[in-house]
C-alpha cells in the first residue's frame, strides 16, 4: 500500500470539492442557459472571438468593423481548433466551449441588451470590436474572490486563440515566419573559432 503524499491528498480533496460543486451546477441559471445552447451558437461565439483576436476578410470580422485583406483566424481554421482545445482541456458536462460561449454571450447582452437578434444568433459575435474588448475588460475586472477562474479564463483566452491561429500555415504566412534559423548564412561559423 502506498503512502498518502501531501500532493495526492490535495489532488483528491480538490477532485472531491470539484465534484461537489459540479453536482450543484444544474441549479445555476447560467449552466441551464449554457446547456441549452445550440452547437451553431457555440461555433458562432467562438468564431466571433477568433475574429476579434485575428481579424480577416470574413463575415465575423466585417460585423465587428475590423477587417484585413489577408486571411485571418477564421481562414486558418482556428475556430475548430479552439473548440477542440477547450473541450479537451477540461472534459465536462456541459463542455467548456458551451460555458465559455454562455459567459461571453451573457456579458455581451449585459453590455448591449439589443444586440440579439442580429446578423448572428450569438450576442458576442454581433458586437463591434470595441464592445468585445469591453466584454473582456468587464470579465477581468470582476472583483469577487469566487470569480478567479473567470478572470483567469478571460485573461488567457485571447492568448490561446492567438497561439492557435498563428500555429497554422496561414498564421505563419501572416507573421512572415520564414522557418527555423539553423543553417542561415549569418549563423554559419558563428560558434566556431
Task: Report each predicted region and the residues it spans.
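A general structural signal for short secondary-structure junctions and capping/turn motifs
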Residues: 7, 39-40
Amino acid at each position: 500500500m502506498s503512502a498518502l503524499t501531501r500532493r495526492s491528498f490535495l489532488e483528491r480533496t480538490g477532485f472531491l470539492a470539484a465534484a461537489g460543486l459540479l453536482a450543484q451546477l444544474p441549479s445555476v441559471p447560467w449552466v441551464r442557459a449554457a446547456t441549452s445552447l445550440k452547437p451553431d451558437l457555440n461555433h458562432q461565439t467562438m468564431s466571433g472571438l477568433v475574429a476579434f483576436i485575428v481579424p480577416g476578410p470574413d463575415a465575423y470580422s466585417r460585423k465587428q468593423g475590423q477587417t484585413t485583406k489577408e486571411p485571418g483566424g477564421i481562414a486558418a481554421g482556428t475556430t475548430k481548433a479552439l473548440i477542440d482545445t477547450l473541450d479537451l482541456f477540461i472534459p465536462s458536462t456541459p463542455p467548456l466551449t458551451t460555458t465559455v460561449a454562455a459567459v461571453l454571450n451573457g456579458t455581451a447582452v449585459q453590455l448591449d441588451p439589443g444586440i440579439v437578434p442580429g446578423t448572428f444568433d450569438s450576442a458576442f459575435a454581433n458586437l463591434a470590436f470595441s464592445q468585445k474588448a469591453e466584454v473582456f475588460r468587464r470579465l477581468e475586472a470582476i472583483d469577487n474572490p469566487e470569480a478567479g477562474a473567470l478572470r483567469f479564463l478571460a485573461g488567457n483566452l485571447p492568448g490561446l486563440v492567438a497561439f492557435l491561429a498563428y500555429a497554422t500555415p496561414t498564421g505563419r504566412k501572416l507573421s512572415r515566419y520564414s522557418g527555423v534559423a539553423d543553417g542561415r548564412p549569418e549563423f554559419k561559423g558563428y560558434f566556431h573559432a
